[in-house]
């Protein structure tokens, strides 16, 4: 049976992006200073999750992330507490009505990473 292992995104500043995703609960589990293609790589993972987010920085590459290209999703047992924590740190949580309950009783919100990738925050439980 196949297993979904990782998702790779390009980033404009590897250290800045690692720090940003740490605020969401990710840990940097591995770094490669220079791949055979000349990229700097970091592999992030939420403890207990099998999926890995691979960050790829290529010196000299002009990063442009088209709006609504893709998003990742992270679940939290207390979405209100996580969003309040992020807002206190200056993160913009959207849409404005994220506190409403959506179909099937769940709530969701979004936050945008430093390069423009959207991260969906889902209430779990």
Protein language model features and the residues they cover:
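Vicinal oxygen chelate
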Residues: 12-15, 67, 72-118
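Active-site beta-strand termini and strand-to-loop segments that position acidic
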Residues: 44-49, 111-114, 124
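Core segments of cupin and vicinal oxygen chelate
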Residues: 2, 8-50
């Amino acid at each position: 049976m196949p297993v979904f292992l990782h998702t790779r995104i390009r980033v404009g500043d590897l250290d800045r992006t690692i720090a940003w995703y740490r605020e969401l609960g990710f840990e940097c589990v591995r770094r490669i200073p220079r791949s055979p293609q000349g990229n700097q790589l970091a592999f992030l993972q939420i403890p207990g999750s099998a999926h890995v987010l691979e960050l790829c920085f290529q010196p000299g590459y002009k990063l442009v992330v088209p709006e609504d290209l893709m998003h990742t999703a992270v679940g939290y047992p207390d979405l209100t507490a996580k969003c309040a924590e992020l807002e206190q740190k200056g993160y913009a949580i959207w849409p404005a009505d994220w506190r409403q309950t959506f179909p099937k009783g769940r709530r969701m919100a979004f936050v945008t990473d430093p390069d423009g990738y959207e991260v969906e925050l889902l209430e779990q439980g």
